[in-house]
């Protein structure tokens, strides 16, 4: 299996970062509770409970507000649904820091669950790449972009940011189409670093899940007693990747186990960094 020193170091680091993340998240929850409890209760807010609850759930599941943007709707839906489904891979990740062939009880080798995991790992990865490209192409939400919709773009931009780029250097004419050439980025007013942080967290986590599935296939295929699980039935979308890993590692179980430890640690640390940040930045 994996190098004992490497496994112990990654395990200890994961536990330390996780403890700090939980404390940060608890602090964030307490802050939100204090803020909410400072308000005046509205006895009728929840009524009718069923109708309001269904409205929230149906709006989230159908993404009906994303009208006219089918690709963005599909990408965002895949990313959203991948969150709860891939949570269980985080649990697996902790265990794999110590036992690299670990799988979840009951679900670990349950083919429908494995298919679901891989579909949403790849789907979440593709979805977040689409959303990142859309955000990049939509502009950065700068004062210069916002000024494009003004009757005097250069004057408005200079008033908002004297050192900024004159809108006239970006594009003329300036259609009102929510693009960098038009009314400005649709993300105007959002905090860009927060968006980039969330996007990269999702990208890294989904990529780690895909890579780990391939590594699991590889280590199962070279481990006596587990090789029966190394098949397309259990790894429908990552068996090809696992075969590449087997060849690259020259069928060395130790090399594959070390790789599992490193990728699992990256996934855990990335997830806990996200938990820490949202505990500090409760307005994200």
Language-model regions, residue ranges each:
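Membrane-embedded alpha-helical bundles of multi-pass integral membrane proteins
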Residues: 1-284
């Amino acid at each position: 299996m994996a190098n004992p020193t490497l496994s112990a170091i990654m395990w200890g680091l994961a536990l330390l970062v996780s403890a700090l993340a939980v404390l940060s998240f608890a602090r964030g929850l307490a802050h939100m509770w204090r803020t909410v409890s400072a308000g005046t209760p509205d006895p009728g807010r929840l009524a009718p409970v069923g109708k309001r609850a269904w409205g929230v759930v149906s709006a989230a599941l159908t993404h009906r507000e994303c009208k006219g943007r089918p690709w963005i709707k599909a990408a965002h839906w895949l990313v959203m649904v991948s969150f709860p489904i891939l949570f269980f891979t985080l649990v697996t990740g902790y265990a794999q820091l110590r036992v690299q062939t670990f799988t979840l009880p009951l679900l670990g080798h349950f083919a429908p669950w494995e298919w679901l995991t891989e579909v949403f790992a790849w789907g979440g990865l593709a979805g977040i790449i689409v959303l990142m490209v859309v955000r990049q192409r939509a502009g950065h939400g700068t004062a210069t972009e916002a000024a494009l919709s003004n009757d005097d773009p250069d004057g408005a931009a200079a008033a908002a940011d004297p050192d900024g780029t004159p809108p006239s250097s970006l594009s003329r004419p300036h259609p009102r189409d929510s693009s960098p050439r038009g009314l400005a980025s649709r993300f105007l007013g959002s905090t860009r670093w927060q968006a980039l942080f969330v996007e990269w967290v999702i990208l890294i986590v989904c990529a780690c899940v895909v890579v780990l599935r391939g590594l699991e296939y590889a280590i199962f295929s070279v481990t006596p007693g587990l090789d029966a699980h190394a098949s397309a039935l259990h790894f429908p979308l990552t068996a090809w990747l696992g075969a590449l890993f087997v060849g690259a590692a020259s069928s060395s179980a130790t090399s594959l186990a070390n790789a599992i430890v490193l990728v699992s640690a990256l996934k855990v640390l990335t997830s806990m960094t996200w938990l820490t940040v949202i505990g500090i930045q409760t307005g994200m």
